[in-house]
């Protein structure tokens, strides 16, 4: 019996021993860091020997640098979007432009020469190479004009670029450790980190921190292996920020747009001005883009200018792209030659009529069509204006997701004033609503002030409104609740202040305060149609002027003369001196 028990015990013991060994092995595997290394060519997505990865501010870019004859070239779109948006590539005429505060710097494709205004300079090797879809620009040429630094590394080839400056958090490795693809000891190793090596901490975690090495490897490191954690100031001591100057007035701007549709209208300027108070800038709508070569239509009058000057009023001629629908503004602005012609035409008009300022009112611009070209147009025009003592103002819509390309901050570097077109919140073809509700205007102003200094902002205000006509799509349905405007055909007509008020009283309606819009509102029924109007009057105007005063803006602008009730000017002069 004992002989039978002994082998059984041995077998059980062996099973326990084997299970123990398996358990211990499993624990060892679980808690032993992997030594697997990540393929850095795969990590940086490098597929050919002439490519270099681009790491910008510790983020790996989808774009790649090209190594050509030992020189580093980067794609124009990468330069524009990630390094310096002031570079402009004219793909039509194969020229690279960069605009400083005082000069236009140009470089033709496949040339080593760049021109600063009219002075030629030799860069030493090809600056820009045209490609089928874009252009490749020498990185050292970009660096010459940009607040960036870069370093090159190999195995694999990569370029580490810094564009953001300021405070960063750094740490040192307390012992030899690793940067891994993800947080965890089983994640592949990106880099062996030596004791004392400095890293930038990008994100703090409980056990693992996201960090970047100086040679552009971004991964995760055990927080317990870091020491000497501190905040460091990152500076580029090799770059001096460019100084921009502006032609600004030592008084509040009170600008009135004066719509001129033919030359004979200019003779009415004395009567128009006599009905205003406090206006110190007239902006007549005299000029518009009239052909695809950059030519202008001209409705201006020297007598008009002389009269304004005799009254102590400046004249800022308005130049627009709206009147001639047959003109391809995109073509004009995307070709450097025709864009230059347009600028020269504007300056010629300014000289001929002794204009004090130029007001640019280009609208319906999309980024895809010519957004970047429009900003380049403003830069180049600003240099010409400033060289001749002429003020430049630019009319812009309120900031929105679809017009971020306007780059208002850079626009403000070059233009003297940015005029917010604080109207057309609702427009012909939209749902019924206010032309410029107070919350909408306030938001638009606040968003603009995030990019443009207050002393360069002029708030544009409407002197008109829209009366909305809502007709049921089903003629058998009575006008009831209009919350669902999809049930109605909606049209609108523009009315000046007095004409809109007359419509309200003429239809036996009563206007009452609408707290949501900050305006007086009226509605009435007629012939199974509902009419709505958010009035522009002294109430709405004063609330916007209060915004000008509160935010210490450069002034206000009004569209357009002839739409106003004469009583508004007493309110205007309370706020604009």
Where are the predicted features?
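SH3/SH3-like beta-barrel fold
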Residues: 98, 196, 208-213, 221
